[in-house]
C-alpha cells in the first residue's frame, strides 16, 4: 500500500490556507485538491479551510516553515 498524506491545502507563495465557506462537500476544495500541482484524491471544507486527502508526500500542507500567512 502507498501511504497518502492529508492536510490543509496551503498557498506556497504566502503560507495561507485555501479558504472555503460551504462546510462539508465543497466543489472548490475538491477541485483545488485534485489540481495537477496538488495531486490529491478528495477535498472538502473543514473549519472554513480546504482539507485534502490522498496527497503525495511532495505536496506541502499547512503550516509552511517561514511563511505564516501575514501573522508574526
From Swiss-Prot:
Its main location: secreted. It is found in: Secreted. The modification Cysteine amide is found at residue 69. Disulfide bonds join 16-69, 20-45, 29-50, 33-52. InterPro entries: LCN-type_CS_alpha_beta_dom, Scorpion_toxin-like, Scorpion_toxin-like_sf, Scorpion_toxinL, Scorpion_toxinL/defensin. It holds the Pfam family Toxin_3. GO terms for biological process: defense response. Expressed by the venom gland. One of its GO terms (molecular function) is sodium channel inhibitor activity. Keywords: Amidation, Disulfide bond, Ion channel impairing toxin, Neurotoxin, Secreted, Signal, Toxin, Voltage-gated sodium channel impairing toxin. Residues 1-4 form the signal peptide. Residues 5-70 form the LCN-type CS-alpha/beta domain. One of its GO terms (cellular component) is extracellular region. Beta toxins bind voltage-independently at site-4 of sodium channels (Nav) and shift the voltage of activation toward more negative potentials thereby affecting sodium channel activation and promoting spontaneous and repetitive firing. Belongs to the long (4 C-C) scorpion toxin superfamily. Sodium channel inhibitor family. Beta subfamily. Has the structural arrangement of an alpha-helix connected to antiparallel beta-sheets by disulfide bonds (CS-alpha/beta). This is Toxin Cll8.
